[in-house]
Amino acid sequence: MVTSSSSPPLATSQLPVMKGEEKPSNWAELPPDLLSSILLRLSPLEILENARKVCRSWRRVSKDPLIWRRIDMRNLRRLYCIYAMEACCRHVVDLSQGGLLEFNIDQWRFQTTSLLNYMAERSSNLRRLRVKGGQITSVGIFEAIVKLPLLEELELLYCSIEEEHFKTIGQACPNLKTLKLVGFWSHLNESDNDALAIADTMPGLLHLQLISNGLTNIGLNAILDGCPHLECLDLRQCFNINLFGDLERQCLERIKDFRCPNDVLDDYNYVIFSDNGSIEDEKGEEEENYSYGSDDTEYGYRRSADF
């Protein structure tokens, strides 16, 4: 969705109109500022498939790179073909013309190693990156992120990163302030590799989330020593940590917002952990009711020639 995280999608019926004598006779007469405000509330598909087709003025504004500074591609439910997903994502990256600041991609259903690199090579000013997926390789993520020296926020869900890649990422992104890592069931195996890499290379972190990570007390102590500016630390489902004594006191006194391993995931809706230990990806109502076999989108196989 091409919008801030706090702005909900805007349905066609909700499009704002001017009142009284200022109301235009048709959509083509909307002031550019108001039109830009409308498009910023729409998803990439809503712009590409609908909004830009309203009239020439809408198409012209939809090509403005400022419309594409924040791209959210999490919900490409209508693009049932993985090649169409890649094509659409690459197209919106092109439309940003190097001005992309935020990129949010749901990789759960298709491979994005090449897409991530495509985006990174054209978006060196990127500040925030969120990737969700279980197939993309550590090398693929590493090769993309090291091309983003201005990155401030990084969120990786169900992505495996090797220790040496993690360290290089920390060195390549000195402005990193927020890091969120969500694993599968890695907390079942003790491993401080992630924690030690973070402590060694990311001293400027303010917000750190390690959900379902295998770190132990050793890794936690290293993070507390190596990241002295931490304000928020989320260790939910990190069950290899034993909080007691000085370690517990240090966490509670130093960290303004501290989440313990046993704290509930009531504010976390990316994944559902079932009783039998399997992982169930949450689906919205739109996806449940949508048929991926239908061919009602121009992105089914190719991009429209007039855009």
Swiss-Prot record:
The keyword Repeat applies. Keywords: Leucine-rich repeat, Repeat. Residues 1-15 have a biased composition (Polar residues). Gene3D superfamilies: Ribonuclease Inhibitor. It holds the Pfam family LRR_At5g56370. Residues 279-289 have a biased composition (Acidic residues). InterPro entries: F-box-like_dom_sf, F-box_dom, LRR_dom_sf, LRR_FXL15/At3g58940/PEG3-like. Residues 24-71 form the F-box domain. PROSITE patterns: FBOX (PS50181). Residues 1-26, 279-307 are annotated as: Disordered. LRR repeats lie at residues 108-133, 158-183, 185-210, 212-237, 244-270. This is Putative F-box/LRR-repeat protein 22. It comes from Arabidopsis thaliana. The lineage of its organism: Eukaryota, Viridiplantae, Streptophyta, Embryophyta, Tracheophyta.
